[in-house]
Amino acid sequence: MKKHLLVGLLAATLCVMVIACNNKQDMSTRTKFPWVANVTAPRNYPVEVKYGFVGFGQGQKYPIMSSFANAGIGISKGEVSFADLDGEGLAMPNRLEVLWLSYTERKFYKADIAFSEKLQARILSLFQEGYENEQKHENYSCFLVTLLPGGKIWLYLNGIARYSLVCDTLQADAIDMALGDFDKDALLVDSTVEDYCKGNLNKEQVANLKENGVPYELWSKYQERFNYDIEFEFEDNLCKIDSFHFAKHFINGEFNYACDGVKVGELSRPKQLYLKWNVADTTYTGEFFFDEQEVLDMFSKGFSHKTANVRGTFMVKVSKYNNRFDIYLQVGDYKYYLKNSQIDVFKVTPENEKDNDHLFYWNYEGEEVRKYIGA
């Protein structure tokens, strides 16, 4: 009886392995996937899109239906889907046509760009590879076009719990256009492009524009990548990291969980980290928000030395009682500390798990987290 049971288990295991291998093989040869197209722009630098199309296949076009965009770089909201997300899907994006008005610059930009073979191959490869999310294989579902000041265009593949920047080198052309040609209804509101743009900015955006202008070089900083790892070190040896709840949000808009199985190369500067860790039956959840200027300066200094080709470490050291934090970048023998990070830590124990408030530690006044200028 045991022998027959063992044979049955081996057969079942072999069957699962064959199915898994076939699924992997099918994915690696697949050239169509379900995806939708969307557009976004930095929160402080909104745009209005006259038209947008993502080309795919043999001259086919996927329309971008959103007209107003400022959800933030790398962030997709409110996309309209024409794809069957459970079906065969669409061929890979291979072209972009878009015309938009930048409210903060009072400028029109136009692009009609055929993607290089290299970019198309990268997009296909990412779809074929997918990623892991809490032990479940996921795939990207959104092709996101991010429109930046100066006519820069960044392209992302977004999915559940992962945003990947696939191209940050596309450039649109500034063009002259009459307001009525852009949108005839706009003339019912204002007679000039300048007045129309001013009227479409909210109070926050107006205040930011007055203080910071349009810092074109800032997005060049956001693009930069560095050779480093992100690590947590605990003074209490009993602390155990919950690898399924270790999330990283970067200054270039990328977002991922540490356990997603995607090979890590060079990284953008960190913007925010989220981590759960356990000590016996107590669970801590930490949210770490880094100051924009500090992070910009830290990495510029840290990787300016001769040791810049050495892999660095962005370290968060946690005290024995989980209420003190040292955060620094180490490259070779050099350490650069962050002093202005905003930190929240929540603590859940068997005794307080039914309580509404689990806030255990915070180091700043009020509830407002500082926002990045160009994000």
What are the roles of these predicted feature ranges?
Residues 1-8:
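Bacterial N-terminal signal peptides that target proteins for export
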Residues 17-20:
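C-terminal motif of bacterial Sec signal peptides marking the signal peptidase cleavage site
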Residues 22-24:
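Bacterial signal peptide processing site
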Residues 108-114, 283-293:
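Edge beta-strands of extracellular beta-sandwich domains
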Residues 115-155, 296-313:
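Low-complexity, Pro/Ser/Thr- and charge-rich linker/hinge segments at domain boundaries
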